[in-house]
């Protein structure tokens, strides 16, 4: 853990504890190294823009169960962990982040992305700054 660039936390506007919280979100959201650093950038961009993080894993954490598909009612759960309803980071980590997730949180990829979605069968995510592009991907996903 000492080999991590903890000095970057301040540059990102985060405390070390907030880095751990963010890394826990990355741990639950991104399966691949390339995606981890991009998810980290999305989180940082959304925090800076004061946008809701809208992380499904935080809703699952609030529900106390991991689900393949969340329902409309799930997204309305009143919990500080629900990043659809409450702005900013959740109050505590939602998982135990690994070193790769911590490093991603401290060294996010450069980019202006605000949205991401799993768009490939192997679980890789696509990233965009465009809400209309994000909606298009969701529609394609829903269509099968």
Tell where the protein language model's regions lie, with residue ranges.
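Bacterial extracytoplasmic/cell-wall-associated proteins, especially those involved in peptidoglycan
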Residues: 1-144
């Amino acid at each position: 853990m000492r080999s991590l660039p903890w000095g970057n936390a301040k540059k990102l506007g985060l405390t070390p504890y907030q880095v751990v919280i963010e890394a826990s979100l990355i741990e639950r959201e991104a399966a691949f190294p390339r995606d981890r650093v991009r998810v980290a950038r999305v989180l940082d961009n959304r925090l800076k823009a004061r946008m809701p993080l809208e992380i499904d894993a935080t809703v699952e954490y609030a529900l106390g169960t991991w689900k393949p598909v969340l329902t409309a009612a799930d997204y309305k759960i009143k919990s500080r962990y629900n990043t659809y309803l409450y702005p900013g980071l959740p109050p505590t980590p939602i998982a135990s982040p690994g070193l790769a997730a911590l490093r991603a949180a401290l060294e996010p990829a450069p980019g202006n992305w605000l949205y991401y979605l799993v768009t490939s069968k192997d679980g890789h995510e696509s990233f965009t700054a465009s809400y209309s592009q994000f909606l298009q991907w969701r529609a394609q996903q829903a269509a099968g």
